Amino acid sequence: MAPRKLAAGNWKMNGDLAALSQIDAIVAGRETGCDVLICPPAVLLHPMVARIGGGDLLVGGQDCHHAGSGAHTGDIAAAQLADAGASHVILGHSERRADHGETDADVAAKARAAHDAGLIAIICVGETEAERDAGTTLDVIAAQLQGSIPDCATSANTVIAYEPVWAIGTGRTPDNAQIAEVHAMIRDALSATLPDVSLLYGGSVKAANATEIFAIDNVDGALVGGASLKAADFLPIVSALAAS
Ligand code: PGA
């Protein structure tokens, strides 16, 4: 089995019911040849699924709790995401790690809950700028992989997103050799346990750099923030992946 190609959009805390019109354009304009996923704020999940109708577009959550249900005000269980129509959930995004103090162990527990609910967990890893400058990128990422991936992970229920923290929302990206180096290390580290796992790159992916990034070995897709909010920005990225 070859890794599946996935173009994933992360709307973060952006969008409202009016923004769902973008979904019509994505469903109408998307090419086959890769999976396409949009992860909106949780309140938009169900209306987005309704809007997609029979269209070939996946939706996902941006986080879930590690428990199945209970007294956790403001949190969302993985089964509730699945019930709303989600197929995937992003876990351990650097914004969750920074804003909410999520540790690798938290991410692993959430991923276990996601798998129990039948969701595909997109587990995010990535170094800060200080870590890159200190030359510790590969060690940092190896440790995040080791700590954030639960034993129940398989190539089918897990996706790994390499997202250098300093490239997110900044317009800066690593050079191709830097992306290739990290993706090769991740592929190698997971070769025994998750041999066909999809490896996404994330951080300032846009139409102008997508083709170049998708040509890099072991890049099976992208996790896209800002450029996923508008169909006109996102569709060229989807096309570039489908053509890669
Ligand atoms: P960006 O965000 O594409 O806006 O840099 C990527 C991400 O955080 O997943």
Region annotations inferred by a language model:
Residues 1-244:
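Active-site loop-to-helix "anion-binding N-cap" substructures in soluble metabolic enzymes
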